Amino acid sequence: MTRISHITRNTKETQIELSINLDGTGQADISTGIGFLDHMLTLLTFHSDFDLKIIGHGDHETVGMDPHHLIEDVAIALGKCISEALGNKLGIRRYGSFTIPMDEALVTCDLDISGRPYLVFHADLSGNQKLGGYDTEMTEEFFRALAFNAGITLHLNEHYGQNTHHIIEGMFKSTARALKQAVSIDESKVGEIPSSKGVL
């Protein structure tokens, strides 16, 4: 079974090329021009064992906008690629849950590849710091776009933490580990849809 997908997303605001292999080895080739976002997506790739290539350009490079559009559109493209690569979802474990201690911060991701997109996001990032050109308040928007385009029910909870970088890093790492669990194949359920309804 090959679980690979590629998407090209071009709008008046962004240009994105993204490809993913869900059965990869954690190889990342990420270039969005937003250093902190590249760092987080590289961590997502490594901890999920996906292979991920992203080339992204946005209007923040040409007309002086903030990188809001590119951050959200990368998440949209990533979500769509994950959904497409999963295909009919036969045999997947469907659920994933992982807690990451990131120094003083503790973050949990719980997710369900349910086909019912939803985001619950509990974290205090209201200070809207800038990290490497990345607006921290965009973190919730990133995960919302990811969840709604991948068809995932996604719960992200910051239990506690002080360093914003650590909290966000914990979110990306815990999401990666939970995705790794959820997309993995349950050898006892190969060829079966993981739902009593027979459809996801």
UniProtKB/Swiss-Prot annotation:
Pfam families: IGPD. Substrate binds at residues 13, 39-47, 68-72, 94, 116, 165-173, 195-197. This is Imidazoleglycerol-phosphate dehydratase. One of its GO terms (molecular function) is metal ion binding. It catalyses: D-erythro-1-(imidazol-4-yl)glycerol 3-phosphate = 3-(imidazol-4-yl)-2-oxopropyl phosphate + H2O. Pathway: Amino-acid biosynthesis; L-histidine biosynthesis; L-histidine from 5-phospho-alpha-D-ribose 1-diphosphate: step 6/9. Its main location: cytoplasm.
